[in-house]
Structure formats: structure tokens, C-alpha cells
Amino acid sequence: HVEGALLTETLLQASGARVIKEEVALSVSSAGYQIAGERYDQVILATGAWLGQILESIGYQVDVRPQKGQLRDYQLDLDTDEYPVVMPEGELDIIPFQKGKISMGATHENEMGFDLMVDQALLNQMETEALAYYPELAQATVVGERVGTRAYTSDFSPFWGALPNQAGIYVASGLGSSGLTTGPLIGWHLAQLVAGGNLRLDSADYPVEQYVKKRVGQKS
């Protein structure tokens, strides 16, 4: 079972890429694209539920909404290395890791915007449901909660590829709960687009123009 944060950190270290954690805006000029005072010929925007905010400044409207997700982490005094992942019908998933760690979640809250507050009552309700599948949770120690924001489109489909009418900008969003599994594949394809390489998937199956459009009255 994959620890997403650890995987991301490992890949970043292996790539040697410089990571700058900063809130930025995108602007277009005759010399290219400006981000945080730097000029670029090509840009990949993989900003999840925030894609609409980035593209709004250059005249686009984006069919992407935020969905709040919460989960709870537990520690058990058991060997969970061979425990299976349990995915019953509904929102509940129970994901065991090594050395007794188990994660339970996650909520799918469509009306909470970008709120990141933990709702203990909601997680307690989910825990009660989880006990039917993992009675051991009753003896587990709660070690923390995590809250994040997923990106969804109106039809729950992801999209990726070139931004319409704006050469050199590539976008991806709408991955929802599949980001950890499908994100690396889509990221590879975006890198291939920038580098002029060959694709394994047909980008026409994930049409950007269906979800990202120029606002009425905006010039192409």
C-alpha cells in the first residue's frame, strides 16, 4: 500500500527538480507566460480544484469544483502487513499499511468548498460503519485526521491536454479520488506533450475543451 506523501517526496528528490511553494498567478505577454516574475515558453497547470482560479485571469471558465475529503488514521498493536484493503459500497474505505497503521475514510462533501476543518462527528459516524468490517478499530489509537480538497468535473470525468486557443499551456484536472493512482500517468503524458514525445493514451478521450472554455466576449 502506497504512502502518497512519501512517494511524492521520493520522486521529487529523485528528479532533482527545484520546488517553490508559493501562491502565484499566470499572465500572458508577447514574450510568453509570466509566473512569479519568471518567463516560460510552455506551462503545465496541474492545480486541481484551483485550476479555474488560475485560468480565470486569462479569460477562461472551468468546469471544476472542489470536494472536501476527510479521513482518520489509527495505530493498532497488530501486524497489518498482510491485511486487505476493504472497499464496501458507499464512501467508506479501510486501508491498512505496515506496522499497524490503518487509514479510514474518506468523506465526499460537495458543498464545503475549500474548507479544511476536521468534522469529528462525521468521522465518528464513518468509524461506526467501519467497525462492522474491522472490529479491531475499537482497540485502536486515533493518531490523527487529514483533510484535503479533490477536483471534480460536473460529469466526474478527468481531462488533460493542451489548453484551447493558447499554445504552450497544458492542463489537467478532475481526477477526484483517483489522483494518486492516475495522476502519475497523466503527469507523464503532459511531460510528453511538452517534450514532443509519443503518447500512450489518446488525449481526445479526455477532452480539455469540454471543460475549459473561453468566457463569452473574450478573444481567442
Language model region names:
Residues 32-34, 101-102, 169-170:
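Hydrophobic residues embedded in beta-strands of well-ordered beta-sheets
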Residues 14-18:
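A structural motif corresponding to the C-terminal end of an alpha-helix
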Residues 36-39:
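Glycine-rich phosphate-binding loop signature in dinucleotide/nucleotide-binding domains
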Residues 42, 47-164:
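Active-site substrate-recognition segment that forms the wall
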Residues 19-34:
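A conserved short coil-to-beta-strand element within the FAD-binding core of flavoproteins
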